[in-house]
């Protein structure tokens, strides 16, 4: 039990998420401990319960935040490539697809950086952790947030889409 809790806390810290609200974190872990022992999945549940903190960290109040979204086709390809094992899940995307997606990420990230903005990618909840895994070797500090981690009063504007063909 100890190592599951510690892994989830480490996962949160690795992505720059505050773990000050230990009560919420431990309550969420207790709520879901019976259904899964996968620390990546548990981390996603905890992130969703910390949506207020995540929203205030990345999305200033009374301001529209420019974000990058994922083409639904890319989300489908990522989910289709997920393989579950005893040790957890991993992606089996072929190198060509991975390269095409990374090129698109690079283009969109550069576009936002050139506008003086922090690149933030918004994904559907089920894809978030896999997209983060896919990109972390190339874009270590890329912020990836799921729709379920964003408060309803946050104003977002999509200024780019990560697609496989990169020319969208």
Predicted feature locations:
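Long, non-coiled-coil amphipathic alpha-helical linker/lever segments
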Residues: 6, 11-12
